[in-house]
């Protein structure tokens, strides 16, 4: 893990098959995770800018979450002026049957990070970033090229997207 003392939240992952008992257990775990988040915000009121979550945790063991949990995360972000970021590096670009895994949930992120399946890495940002007057998507700086990409990768990814669309691979 990074050397920063970032708050880490227990994962309220689903277990399959989903029985009444499993559902009760995961609801209790979700409540615990939400309490951990609220405590972290209370303890660090000016230090937390975002909640970052994988819609399906890959490195954590193929962990799935309920829509209700993602909705709670979105609500916490809205109530605390935080960004809701979905890490789609392992789950994006059609791997779940939709372009993005977060599309299986009712809540939408402010920022999406992606990579691997697209053979390029990057991020998509909603207009919510415009709430910050001077941000890296708007203001030129020496670090912009870090996530700026290159022409070869962009052309390759465009061709990948065209093939997925033409072949109707997500239908």
Language-model features: locations:
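Conserved N-terminal phosphate-binding loop of PLP-dependent enzymes in the Aspartate aminotransferase
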Residues: 1-171
């Amino acid at each position: 893990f990074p050397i920063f003392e970032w708050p880490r939240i227990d994962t309220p992952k689903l277990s399959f098959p989903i029985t009444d008992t499993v559902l009760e257990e995961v609801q209790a775990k979700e409540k615990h995770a939400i309490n951990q988040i609220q405590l972290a915000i209370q303890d660090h009121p000016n230090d937390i800018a975002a909640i970052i979550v994988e819609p399906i945790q890959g490195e954590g063991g193929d962990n799935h979450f309920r829509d209700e949990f993602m909705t709670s995360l979105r609500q916490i972000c809205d109530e605390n002026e935080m960004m809701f970021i979905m890490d789609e590096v392992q789950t994006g670009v059609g791997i779940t049957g939709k372009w993005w895994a977060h599309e299986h949930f009712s809540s939408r992120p402010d920022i999406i990070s992606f990579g691997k399946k697209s053979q390029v890495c990057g991020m998509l940002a909603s207009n919510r970033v415009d709430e910050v007057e001077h941000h890296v998507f708007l203001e030129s700086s020496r670090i912009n090229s870090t996530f700026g990409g290159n022409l070869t990768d962009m052309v390759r990814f465009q061709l990948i997207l065209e093939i997925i669309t033409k072949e109707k691979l997500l239908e």
